[in-house]
Amino acid sequence: MINQQLLHPESIVVIGGSNNVHKPGGAIVRNIINGGYKGVLRIVNPKEDEIQGVKAFHDISELPPTDLAILVIPAHMCPETVDRLAEEKGVKAFIIISAGFGEETKEGAKLEQHILDTCERYGAALIGPNCIGLLNSWHHSVFTKPIPTLHEKGVDFISGSGATAVFILESAVTKGLPFNSVWSIGNGKQIGIEDVLQYMDENFDPERDSHVKLLYIENVGNPDKLLFHASSLIRKGCRIAAIKAGSSESGSRAASSHTGAI
């Protein structure tokens, strides 16, 4: 499920945020700050009092209620963290950057399923795990560079591969191509490419929204849903360009890094 806490959170907490901008936990904090996020940014780090000028909480128990949580911590710590955030702090949206889930081991798949079950029980949105994050005009919750020029009529880009997303963004930035949003779905445990298209279709405003969608597809959980909403958006005047990975040897290797979505 895609909700307003995911798209336009009034408050964000980065679990595992750090001062090291060369690591995901530090880079994502930097991007949120540099992106001009106007809500309240919070960080949980048990070893620091301040992260990049932002007060750091040492434990989840110290946090006020928060809309969106971004997890940049080891996979084995994520299920309990999601449980606590959803139950104790009313978090309604999660972006899990961490890898080490169903794309790697059966034990990782169990951790991933636990997280999904918790999100479903509390009515929370889930992006990931194993992704680079979500980027829109409201919040730049990605740990990668470059950050493209954002414009409401720019491209909506949805990718199953974080590495491919970065490659395409690097190429697009040099050509001056603007974006409206960038979605890295990772393993797509709850929200897949077809779910993002569904949201864009059902909430489409021809005066306000982008008319161009770019898809990099590794796996599709519900092909009929993808086709239905892609066709609907095209009838509304949108143009969709899609690349399906996995047909070549190199594509198959890339797709296998997100086998948790198969």
What does each model-identified segment do?
Residues M1-I262:
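Catalytic-core regions of core metabolic enzymes
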